[in-house]
Design a protein with these regions (language model features):
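Central regulatory/effector-binding core of bacterial HTH transcription factors
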Residues: 2-67, 126, 133
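Hydrophobic residues within well-ordered alpha-helices
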Residues: 9, 50-51, 100, 141-147, ...
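A late-sequence structural motif
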Residues: 15-19, 165-197
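Ligand-binding cleft/hinge of the Venus flytrap
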Residues: 24-31, 97-98, 113-127
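Secondary-structure junction motif
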Residues: 61, 103-123, 187-192
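Short beta-strand->loop
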Residues: 70-80, 131, 151-155, 162-176
Length: 197
């Protein structure tokens, strides 16, 4: 427990909420003198912070695109259909993408970080989205009020307080969340932290 220093982690809300707290708790039990800073951003910001040395580690749901970066898989996050509780899809065993494409779709995106549209494109479908936001809780509230349907990652839905139905998608698509870091100069504390993931 002689390790000191600070670990700066670039992350987004569902990882900060559902993945990191138990890891930090375990790490802190062994290394009480290490401090933490969590920076919240979108995926390209997070990767940029790690590349520039602003953050020691980052979490993004894809591979890093920059040079000199390494990644290790952290968790598989299934993508789920989110529909109003009174929707005909609410009781479906699995929801086909085609059924969602016919509804008013509320899209989770920020800048270029859109994991959902490619899902439809690969299936040869076009998604009709009149509403898009980066706030997953806003999406759940809108679905609850009958404004449309959406697809959200299971991690986000883990503590869903809204009156919506969450159903598996046909084919069970998922995203891979990775821990990313610079290969050249990852700090001792950050390297040790990676072992706790």
């Amino acid at each position: 427990g002689l390790m000191r220093g600070k670990i700066c982690i670039g992350t987004f809300s569902s990882v900060a909420t559902h993945v990191l707290p138990p890891v930090i708790a375990r790490f802190r039990a062994d290394h009480p003198d290490v401090d933490y800073e969590l920076l919240m951003g979108d995926y390209s910001e997070i990767e940029q912070w790690v590349a520039e040395g602003r953050c020691d580690l980052g979490f993004i749901p894809r591979e890093p695109r920059g040079a000199g970066m390494a990644s290790r898989p952290l968790v598989q996050d299934e993508l789920m259909a989110v529909v109003p509780a009174d929707s005909s899809l609410a009781t479906a065993e699995v929801v086909p993408l085609a059924d969602l494409a016919n509804e008013q779709f509320i899209l989770l995106e920020r800048g270029t970080d859109d994991e959902i549209t490619p899902l439809f494109r690969r299936a040869g479908l076009t998604v009709r989205s009149k509403l898009s936001t980066w706030d997953d809780y806003a999406i759940m509230a809108m679905v609850e009020d009958g404004l449309g349907v959406s697809i959200l990652p299971a991690l986000i839905l883990r503590r869903c307080q809204f009156d919506v139905a969450v159903r598996p998608l046909e084919g069970h698509p998922h995203r891979q969340i990775n821990a990313i870091y610079r290969t050249a100069d990852v700090s001792l504390a950050a390297a040790r932290f990676l072992e706790y993931l």
